[in-house]
Design a protein with these regions (language model features):
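Short, surface-exposed amphipathic charged segments that create phosphate/polyanion-binding patches used
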Residues: 10-13, 85-96
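Acidic/histidine-rich catalytic cores and adjacent linkers
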Residues: 5-8, 16-20, 27, 35-36, ...
Length: 178
């Protein structure tokens, strides 16, 4: 999906991942907006779909599962890492800040660290890498979730399905232990 205008009117693009050919474009990102693609494709076309890569839009997910139940759904790296950041890193950061109510200076450092923790290291402004290192050295729970975020990204770069599966199992085990 992509924004058509600044006012957040969206369009949905369906492309063949093998050929990179655009197959269909529709206005909107709701189930109703996406459904005409499956009508156009027909039952035989839907049955031929093996996998679908998409963002974590619930409407897309529900439509794909309804029309192509055999298809493997793969969520894109950006949205998975963003969700991990919102739901895990932010939760740990807020919890850590709340534990420091008696130390306002340290609490403020953690409260103001959101973007430092969520940004990719290569996108940090000059000098912020030192701040990040100091923060992670001083706070083990934040360090743990930051390392887990980095390892989560590596799942998408596995050279083989077997390696991806092994990385997933390792990541999941580590997440349960931390």
């Amino acid at each position: 999906e992509f924004a058509l205008f600044k006012g957040h009117r969206y369009a949905t693009v369906v492309a063949d991942a093998d050929t990179q050919q655009v197959l269909w474009v529709g206005e909107g990102r709701s189930r109703a907006a996406f459904r005409p693609f499956f009508t156009w494709l027909g039952p035989e076309g839907c049955a031929a779909i093996e996998s679908v890569a998409m963002d974590m839009n619930t409407a897309f997910d529900l439509e794909v599962r309804e029309h192509c139940p055999q298809a493997q759904v793969v969520y894109d790296l950006f949205h998975v890492v963003a969700k991990f950041g919102r739901e895990v890193i932010d939760r740990v950061r807020v919890d850590q800040a709340n534990q420091l109510r008696d130390n306002p200076k340290s609490r403020q450092v953690i409260k103001r660290s959101r973007w430092l923790l969520l940004r990719n290291p290569e996108n940090l402004p000059a000098g912020h890498d030192v701040r990040l290192s100091e923060l992670l050295e001083a706070n083990q729970p934040l360090n743990t979730v930051y390392v887990m975020k980095t390892a989560l990204k590596e799942l998408w770069y596995a050279p083989t399905e077997q390696e991806a599966s092994q990385r997933w199992n390792d990541w999941y085990r580590q997440s349960q232990e931390s």
